[in-house]
Amino acid sequence: MGTAKEKKQQIVAEFKDKLSRAQTVIFSNFSGLTVEDDTILRRKFREANSEYKVYKNTLMTIAAKELGYGDDLIKYFEGPTSVAFGYDDPVAPAKVLVEFMKDHKGIELKAGLVNGKLVTVEEIKALAELPSREELVAKALGSMKAPITNLVFVLSGTLRSLLYALNAVKEKKQAEA
């Protein structure tokens, strides 16, 4: 088993890796959460393919400094600090936290990073209002499908009209004969 210093270095390396890989990182104060609420929140993050973890502020400070972040971010590493990471969908962690905060007053947003840029609590809340990646893909596919569907209806209508006209000509010829 490694020494305490080695474990801390490992935690710093893990946090740096997550911080650099994540599209969205949100820092929050979780001091008012019960264990039950925390368990529910962690489950919601897993369901959203996001990650939620608590790190020691001193270790987060070391990692942030090593990655080149300044005091504008580090000042938020005070008091109980939880971290939400969003890797695939940058909106997911913000949606989970903001939605969870509506029913649970024990958690409070501090700040966040979106693609490495520091964002405020207001910007995190605005991010939570955006559609998720899946919703955007569905809308894009729907808008691409609509013109094709309309074209099919127009073409089938034209063919149907042509068939009616040909049928009318045929019936007229038969009536004349």
UniProtKB/Swiss-Prot annotation:
Keyword list, A-Z: Ribonucleoprotein, Ribosomal protein, RNA-binding, rRNA-binding
Name of the protein described by the UniProt record: Large ribosomal subunit protein uL10
Protein family according to the UniProt entry: Belongs to the universal ribosomal protein uL10 family.
Pfam families found in the cross-reference section: Ribosomal_L10
GO cellular component: large ribosomal subunit
Keyword Cytoplasm appears in the UniProt entry: no
PANTHER family, A to Z: 39S RIBOSOMAL PROTEIN L10, MITOCHONDRIAL
Any one GO BP annotation for this protein: translation
SUPFAM superfamilies: Ribosomal protein L10-like
Biological role stated in the UniProt entry: Forms part of the ribosomal stalk, playing a central role in the interaction of the ribosome with GTP-bound translation factors.
GO molecular function: large ribosomal subunit rRNA binding; structural constituent of ribosome
CDD domains linked to this entry: Ribosomal_L10 (cd05797)
Subunit note: Part of the ribosomal stalk of the 50S ribosomal subunit. The N-terminus interacts with L11 and the large rRNA to form the base of the stalk. The C-terminus forms an elongated spine to which L12 dimers bind in a sequential fashion forming a multimeric L10(L12)X complex.
